[in-house]
Amino acid sequence: MAKVLVLYYSMYGHIETMAHAIAEGANKVDGVEVVIKRVPETMNAEAFLKAGGKTQNAPQATPQELADYDAIIFGTPTRFGNMSGQMRTFLDQTGGLWATGALYGKLASVFSSTGTGGGQEQTITSTWTTLAHHGMVIVPIGYGAQELFDVSAVRGGTPYGATTIAGGDGSRQPSQEELAIARFQGEHVAGLAKKLNG
């Protein structure tokens, strides 16, 4: 049975919501085990809550366990066109996995959120760089989700991966179209994982 990990960092809950949609899509594929985990918070609890951080329910992952999965779908908010510091800190601890080639050939995909739309694609593609150094097989979504063709409203979503626009104050929640794109991404990656490892 192929194993898929949805691994995310979410401060305000947008990426957490997207992660659950990704997992929902992945769970549509029979013969795939789907696990949702988050990377550890690096801010102290007081600063996190003072900044408006939302408590997360998913269990924390450890870098070493990444080797246990056939596919990993990474979710991170955009921080100046890059992944969050929390995700960066987590991935910086995977040097041992790199040294042994533990992630080589495993599938990897990325989804993101941004305040105003700036940097979402750059965040995904800059995250790919780290994953490529591990020899992971990058899985974009292309234009497989029909919602990507809908231009009737402002929304996230790119051929690189699912995204959501949170708004400058974080008040905008992922739209139904954005969640549909996320479900597509999860199903797409899980389907490939099953074909390769099922």
Curated annotation (Swiss-Prot):
SUPFAM superfamilies: Flavoproteins (SSF52218). Binds 1 FMN per monomer. Substrate binds at W98. InterPro entries: Flavodoxin/NO_synth (IPR008254), Flavoprotein-like_sf (IPR029039), Flavoprotein_WrbA-like (IPR010089), FMN_Rdtase-like_dom (IPR005025), NQO (IPR037513). Keywords: Flavoprotein, FMN, NAD, NADP, Nucleotide-binding, Oxidoreductase. It catalyses: a quinone + NADH + H(+) = a quinol + NAD(+); a quinone + NADPH + H(+) = a quinol + NADP(+). FMN binds at residues 10-15, 78-80, 113-118, 133. Its EC number is 1.6.5.2. One of its GO terms (molecular function) is flavin adenine dinucleotide binding. Coiled coil: none annotated. NAD(+) binds at Y12. Residues 4-189 form the Flavodoxin-like domain. GO terms for cellular component: membrane. Its cofactor is FMN. HAMAP family: NQOR. Belongs to the WrbA family. This is NAD(P)H dehydrogenase (quinone). It comes from Enterobacter sp. (strain 638).
